[in-house]
A protein has these predicted regions:
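N-terminal glycine-/serine-/threonine-rich beta1-alpha1-beta2 phosphate-ribose binding loop
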Residues: 1-125
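NAD(P)-dependent dehydrogenase/reductase Rossmann-like domain
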Residues: 1-8, 12-26, 32, 37-40, ...
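A generic secondary-structure micro-motif detector
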Residues: 109-110, 134-135, 225, 276
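Rossmann-fold NAD(P)-binding glycine/threonine-rich loop
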Residues: 113-126, 135-174
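Glycine-enriched alpha-helix->loop->beta-strand junction motifs that scaffold or abut catalytic
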Residues: 126-130, 190
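Hydrophobic residues within beta-strands of alpha/beta enzymes
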Residues: 130-131, 184
Length: 371
């Protein structure tokens, strides 16, 4: 039986779903000759670890208890009952590195923190593996990024772009086979994909944003989605894969709300109550203009040469992006082999379940690196 020791950072929606997947897939993995030994789980305040990480692991019952406790985001892992050791925030990073040095583990980052880059780099540097759903380490400054990806065999981050869709794997296959990618255009936000396809049908922008929030498609403050920053991070990850030496502030980002409506100036309640409706006319006019040209509006990332930008683009109705409905992600990749007809990747590109499934697949993809 091949044993893969795992430490999980981040107990939010994706992290909890991953733990549930690991538990429910025990018999499947056993049939494949694999055992995922979860030896530690941490949130921003504490680390829960097996008493003896070399010979023990956190029980499935304890992992499910973690999921239950962390359903309330304000709850701490310190309240857990079970056979485990608990380490405080000040000990957290050192303990993870100690466990990594002892076991040669897979460190899984399902947090949304920009603070994990240090421990990820240390762990990879000592020959361990890292699996990321967290985009922030991969969109940090180039110096930190270069360190993180300096051992590409040890890194997997499929779920950072397109959740469980095979975006990163497809790009890597093209690039490693000598098929240069010269253009990528994609709708990489389920929220903004939904918004743009709904306003195309004549619905007011404000109504669509509120509907998206009620359906759970947006963050608690929809401006976190409407700013385009999440799409920009995904675009930067793809651009860097293609070899571009870019930072986040190099990307041209079109926000769907003006500066005077940004957080800190206007509250989320004010934005939803009165601010967002002031944007209806402009969006409606842009939709109408595109329609006259036989086109539709989509919020996309475009990567071509040294160009990397995100924003609203007019696109043909009969293209893969033009036909997009709902919250799916669509990515068109143009290369030497896919010159006239692009490689199109489409499917659910958001959701805790889909993202966690992608993370689990990444962990299993590293199995040949473990004894």
């Amino acid at each position: 039986m091949k044993n893969i020791p795992v430490v999980l950072m981040g107990c939010g929606g994706v992290g909890r779903q991953l733990l549930q997947h690991i538990v429910t897939c025990r018999s499947l993995h056993a049939n494949q000759g694999i055992r995922l030994r979860v030896v530690g789980v941490c949130d921003s305040k504490s680390l829960v670890a097996a008493p003896d990480v070399y010979s023990m692991e956190l029980s499935d019952n304890l992992l499910l208890e973690v999921c239950r406790v962390k359903l309330d985001s304000s709850s701490s892992l310190l309240t857990l009952n079970g056979e485990c050791q608990v380490y405080s925030n000040s000990e957290l990073t050192k303990k993870i590195i100690d466990i990594a040095a002892l076991l040669g583990l897979a460190l899984v980052d399902c947090s949304a923190s920009s603070e994990t880059i240090g421990v990820l780099n240390r762990v990879v540097d000592i020959g361990c593996c890292a699996v990321l759903a967290n985009k922030k380490p991969l969109t940090s400054k180039m110096e930190d990024y270069d360190k993180l990806v300096s051992h590409p065999r040890f890194i997997r981050h499929e779920s950072t772009v397109g959740a469980g869709l095979p975006v990163i794997a497809s790009l890597n296959r093209l690039l490693s086979s000598g098929d240069p990618v010269h253009r990528i255009i994609g709708s990489l936000s389920g929220t903004l994909g939904y918004v743009m396809s709904e306003v195309e049908d004549g619905k007011p922008f404000s109504q669509v944003v509120k509907s998206a929030k009620s359906l759970g498609y947006t963050e608690p403050d929809p401006r976190d989605d409407l700013s385009g920053m999440d799409v920009a991070r995904k675009a930067l990850i793809l651009a860097r894969l293609l070899g571009q030496r870019l930072n986040l502030d190099s990307i041209k980002i079109e926000s769907l709300y003006p500066e005077e409506m940004r957080p800190g100036v206007m509250s989320a309640e004010e934005f939803l109550g009165s601010g967002v409706s002031l944007l209806d006319k402009d969006i409606q006019e842009r939709v109408h203009k595109a329609s006259l040209n036989g086109n539709v509006l989509r919020y996309v990332c475009v990567i071509e040469g040294s160009r990397c930008e995100v924003g609203i683009q007019e696109l043909p109705k009969d293209s893969a992006l033009g036909r997009l409905k709902g919250s799916d992600n669509v990515l068109e990749i143009y290369s030497r082999c896919y010159f006239e007809q692009p490689l199109v990747i489409q499917g659910a590109g958001a959701g805790n379940d889909t993202t966690a499934t992608g993370v689990l697949a990444d962990i299993l993809d590293l199995q040949d690196l473990f004894p």
